[in-house]
Swiss-Prot record, chain B:
GO terms for biological process: regulation of DNA-templated transcription. The keyword Glycosyltransferase applies. GO terms for molecular function: uracil phosphoribosyltransferase activity. A motif (PRPP-binding) lies at residues 106-118. Signal peptide: none annotated. Belongs to the purine/pyrimidine phosphoribosyltransferase family. PyrR subfamily. Keywords: Glycosyltransferase, Transcription, Transcription regulation, Transferase. The lineage of its organism: Bacteria, Bacillati, Actinomycetota, Actinomycetes, Kitasatosporales. Pfam families: Pribosyltran (PF00156). This is Bifunctional protein PyrR.
Length: 326, 193
């Protein structure tokens, strides 16, 4: 039996709704004076971060500690990885220490999948972002934020995002957040539209379960949520658009553009935001922008995922896709 | 042989609707009597059926005391000691009344008291939420077979059972009718949920 969360595409609708509902209960723990549950007492979780990410790591760490797990943080910098140790050797070291779960962030797409399926380690593997491939807990926390804002906190329990129209704007090519979101939102019944310059769309995007547009202004009036993606300059090895100014003019969200959105529509961003380029300060600081909520929701979602994968003697989350990988 | 006969035996009702209403009324009066007016009582039901019973008790207490009775629910799933013996369960709702439980008399309400492990988990959960003045326990049915030194303060009906029997509580809010059924346990032996 598999007990990993590698890709948002692995989740069935029922799994995804179960995770969102569980996260809603976990969010209540955050409102209490003692934000701790004994659920994972005696279990060891390793945060294995081969790529820098303070935000995701502390989010996972907070979730693990709130569930009383023993947490080991591993960053590649200054470890034996910089001396040339392979992923396999690292995994076998962790296995020998009796680790129950590994939360892995890696710059290589597919590293978590390799770790989960190679037989090197018996622990549950949770993908915390691999290359340009997937970031499933980010997609889940985004869906959670949308459900809370668009359907309602208590009214949303048991429900998906059927018929909601979500627009993702920006650097789709380099974005694991976009890939994970398209997969999950499609599973949850939402209609997704990608808006980006043609140079920032991946080959084969026409096979994804979503619409593609190059024109942000015409998409805004029919969007329930608009998610801006960070332009990932660190992954860009060529010129994908002429100037930042032009990108900002065509694909950035400012106050005037936000006014074209329906009144109930929300603005989302996975962070970190590049203010002035993808989003103006006016939009980022408005009460329609959910960036800070997304961070808080991230802890609840990660608690839910860890509870459902590790809380019992077998995971509660099933797997739609058994072995093949994109 | 015996077992097969048991399994064929129909579950028989030991408490019907009017009996349940009557024992809840009695428990409500006992709470008022023991808590000397029930001024600081908070009722917390344990999902699923304990919550319905807590609400019914609150209604009855309101009739007696003519005061609004704070009532909530306490999910104990995350505090169970058998979590790792089963797949993880979906969580139920924990709702603590606005004024909290600090310094109050918390009455936990559940449908069946069996091993006592659920109540142990509930006491742990309470510990994380606040510090009540005292905690009491009200159950509709006490079927015995305790595995921990825990007893109820208010019992609707003491029901001596064998471990081969099951006690099933049905309430109108969830099951469409009020009844307590005593039946034979199907096949594999396992712990009380």
């Amino acid at each position: 039996m598999q007990r990993h969360l590698i890709s948002a595409a692995d989740l069935t609708r029922d799994d995804a709704v179960l995770i969102l509902d569980t996260a809603e209960e976990m969010a209540r723990v955050a409102d209490r004076p003692i934000k701790k549950l004994p659920t994972l007492r005696g279990r060891t979780v390793v945060n294995l971060f081969f790529e820098d990410s303070t935000r995701t790591r502390i989010s996972f760490e907070a979730a693990e500690k709130r569930l009383s797990a023993d947490v080991i943080n591993f960053t590649a910098k200054g470890s034996s990885v910089s001396k040339g140790e392979s992923l396999k050797d690292t995994a076998q070291t962790l296995e020998a220490m009796g680790v129950d779960a590994v939360v892995i962030r890696h710059s290589a797409s597919g590293a978590p999948y390799r770790l989960a399926t190679s037989g090197w380690i018996d622990a549950a593997v949770v993908n915390a972002g691999d290359g340009t491939h997937q970031h499933p807990t980010q997609a889940l926390l985004d869906a959670f934020t949308m459900r809370r804002r668009l359907v309602g906190r208590d009214a949303g329990l048991g429900k998906d995002l059927d018929g909601r129209r979500i627009t993702l704007v920006g650097d789709i090519l380099h974005s694991r957040v976009a890939r994970s979101n398209v997969d999950l939102l499609h599973t949850l019944g939402a209609e997704v539209t990608l808006v980006a310059p043609p140079t920032l769309l991946p080959v084969g995007v026409e096979t994804w379960p979503c619409e593609v547009s190059y024109d942000l202004d015409s998409t805004l009036p029919k969007s329930d949520a608009v998610m801006l993606l960070r332009v990932q300059r660190e992954r860009m090895n060529a010129a994908f658009f002429p100037t930042e100014r032009e990108y900002s003019r065509r694909y950035g969200l400012d106050g005037d553009r936000m006014a074209k959105m329906p009144d109930h529509a929300i603005v989302m961003h996975p962070g970190p935001m590049v203010r002035g380029m993808e989003i103006t300060a006016e939009v980022a600081d408005s009460d329609r922008c959910t960036v800070v909520e997304q961070v808080a929701n991230g802890v609840s979602i990660r608690m839910a995922v860890l509870y459902l994968l590790l809380g019992g003697n077998e995971p509660a989350v099933s797997h739609a896709r058994p072995t093949e990988e994109k | 042989m015996d077992k097969q006969q048991d399994q064929q035996q129909e579950a028989r009702p030991v408490l019907e609707g009017p009996d349940i209403a009557r024992v809840l009324t009695r428990i409500a009066h006992e709470i008022v009597e023991r808590a000397k007016g029930a001024d600081d009582v908070v009722l917390l039901g344990i999902p699923t059926r304990g919550v319905f019973l807590a609400r019914r008790l609150a209604d009855k207490l309101e009739q007696i005391t003519e005061r609004k009775m704070p009532v909530g629910s306490l999910d104990i799933t995350m505090y169970r000691d058998d979590l790792r013996m089963h797949p993880p369960r979906a969580l139920a709702r924990t709702e603590i009344p606005g004024d909290g439980i600090d310094g109050r008399l918390v009455v936990l309400v559940d449908d069946v008291l069996f091993s006592g492990r659920t109540i142990r988990a509930a006491l742990d959960a309470l510990n994380d939420i606040g510090r009540p003045r005292a905690v009491q326990l009200a159950v509709l049915v006490d079927r015995g077979h305790r595995e921990l030194p825990i007893r109820a303060d208010y019992v609707g009906k003491n029901l001596p059972t064998s471990l081969r029997e099951t006690v099933k509580v049905q309430l109108a809010e969830e099951d469409g009718r009020d009844t307590v059924l005593l039946g034979a346990k199907p096949a594999a032996p396992g712990a009380h949920p």
